[in-house]
Amino acid sequence: MKSLLFTLAVFMLLAQLVSGNWYVKKCLNDVGICKKKCKPEELHVKNGRAMCGKQRDCCVPADKRANYPAFCVQTKTTRTSTVTATAATTTTLVMTTASMSSMAPTPVSPTS
């Protein structure tokens, strides 16, 4: 009986401490979701902090933007990752070509 009461007490404490995804705060008439950061495909609401608080932004999925076009702003994305990936690919190609030419008796021209 004591172990049953202890188990129930633990579950009741965990239900209060761990919210997980049981409650998601909504904003903009239940269209947006309050998050710390919006995904690149989601739209950021200009005055979302008034609805979600200081630490969170109101993020609206791109397919629901037509409902609230005046409030939504497209989030800025950077292309630094693409440039880095291109540079890494070029470096890999140069290294592969150099290692292939040192292994082969005659140099092989790379095809693009």
From Swiss-Prot:
Primary residence: secreted
Post-translational modification: O-glycosylated; glycans contain alpha(2,3)-linked sialic acids.
Cellular-component GO terms for this entry: extracellular region
Presence of keyword Signal: yes
InterPro entries: Beta-defensin
Gene Ontology biological-process entries: defense response to bacterium; single fertilization
Subcellular location: Secreted
Signal peptide as annotated in the record: 1-20
Family assignment from sequence similarity: Belongs to the beta-defensin family.
Quaternary structure (record): Homodimer or homooligomer; disulfide-linked.
UniProt-recorded name of the protein: Beta-defensin 126
Organism name: Hylobates lar (Lar gibbon)
